[in-house]
């Protein structure tokens, strides 16, 4: 993904995580806590397949992350 899309996705993940710990939230998403941290901070891009998997686990839609 492009940098601006990575940032939008990172903000979305932070918002969804709320006060939940990285470890607990990452487990729900099927990723490691370190991967979650990197995604939230736009230090790692996500593949389309992993994005779809994460959204499914959160019961969210693509337009929830990328409204425009």
State what each model feature region is.
Residues 19-21, 46-49:
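Residue-level signal for the short linker/turn that defines the boundary of a DNA-recognition helix
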């Amino acid at each position: 993904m492009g940098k601006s899309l990575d940032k939008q996705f990172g903000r979305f993940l932070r918002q969804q995580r709320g006060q939940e710990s990285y470890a607990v939230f990452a487990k729900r998403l099927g990723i490691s806590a370190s991967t979650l941290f990197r995604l939230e901070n736009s230090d790692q891009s996500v593949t389309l397949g992993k994005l779809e998997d994460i959204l499914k686990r959160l019961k969210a839609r693509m337009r929830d992350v990328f409204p425009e």
